[in-house]
């Protein structure tokens, strides 16, 4: 192989091309690579933060769900207690009302019984006077013997 001027010229041109590339082409390429590398690193950091935020959000949502379930269970328990209380109050009110109605009925029965007893006493007194009249064959003055009849009726 002969080293001639063409080879030297090509070597010089190649060397100038390499210098030109190092001076003008290489820095923007390196800058683009560094920028891309930075964007990728930022994207990875953002993805990591997003994953962490997602995990925290899921944890918070789970906690809120547990709190909501506990609160719902508490509300249900309070509703059950209130329902039981209402039923007990209704029972007590019904019992009091039944006792009142029973006492009122008892008083009415007592009144009716006393009225019937008084009516029977009066009838018994009249029957006794009529019976005595028939037995004695004479008329007995009712006004004169009213006190006697009332005593007799009271004893009965």
UniProtKB/Swiss-Prot annotation:
Domain of life: Bacteria
Compartments reported by the entry: Cell inner membrane
Pfam families to which the protein is assigned, alphabetical: ATP-synt_B
Transmembrane regions: 12-32
MF terms (GO), sorted A to Z: proton-transporting ATP synthase activity, rotational mechanism; proton-transporting ATPase activity, rotational mechanism
Signal sequence coordinates: none
GO cellular component terms, semicolon-separated: plasma membrane; proton-transporting ATP synthase complex
Entry keyword set: ATP synthesis, Cell inner membrane, Cell membrane, CF(0), Hydrogen ion transport, Ion transport, Membrane, Transmembrane, Transmembrane helix, Transport
Coiled coil regions, renumbered to chain: none
Membrane topology label: Single-pass membrane protein
Listed NCBIfam families: ATP_synt_b, PRK05759.1-2, PRK05759.1-4
Function summary: F(1)F(0) ATP synthase produces ATP from ADP in the presence of a proton or sodium gradient. F-type ATPases consist of two structural domains, F(1) containing the extramembraneous catalytic core and F(0) containing the membrane proton channel, linked together by a central stalk and a peripheral stalk. During catalysis, ATP synthesis in the catalytic domain of F(1) is coupled via a rotary mechanism of the central stalk subunits to proton translocation. Component of the F(0) channel, it forms part of the peripheral stalk, linking F(1) to F(0).
Subunit structure: F-type ATPases have 2 components, F(1) - the catalytic core - and F(0) - the membrane proton channel. F(1) has five subunits: alpha(3), beta(3), gamma(1), delta(1), epsilon(1). F(0) has three main subunits: a(1), b(2) and c(10-14). The alpha and beta chains form an alternating ring which encloses part of the gamma chain. F(1) is attached to F(0) by a central stalk formed by the gamma and epsilon chains, while a peripheral stalk is formed by the delta and b chains.
UniProt similarity note: Belongs to the ATPase B chain family.
Name of the protein in its database record: ATP synthase subunit b
Lineage: Bacteria, Pseudomonadati, Pseudomonadota, Gammaproteobacteria, Pseudomonadales
Gene that specifies this protein: atpF
């Amino acid at each position: 192989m002969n080293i001639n001027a063409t080879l030297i010229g090509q070597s010089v041109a190649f060397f100038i091309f390499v210098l030109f590339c190092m001076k003008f082409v290489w820095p923007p390429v390196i800058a683009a690579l560094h920028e891309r590398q930075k964007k990728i690193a930022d994207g990875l950091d953002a993805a990591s933060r997003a994953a962490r935020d997602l995990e925290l959000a899921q944890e918070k949502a789970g906690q809120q769900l547990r709190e909501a379930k506990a609160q719902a269970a508490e509300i249900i328990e309070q509703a059950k207690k209130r329902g039981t209380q209402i039923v007990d109050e209704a029972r007590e009110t019904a019992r009091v009302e039944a006792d009142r109605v029973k006492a009122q009925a008892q008083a009415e029965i007592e009144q009716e019984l006393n009225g019937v007893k008084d009516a029977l006493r009066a009838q018994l007194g009249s029957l006794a006077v009529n019976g005595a009249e028939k037995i004695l064959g004479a008329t007995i003055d009712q006004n004169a013997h009213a006190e006697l009849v009332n005593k007799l009726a009271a004893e009965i």
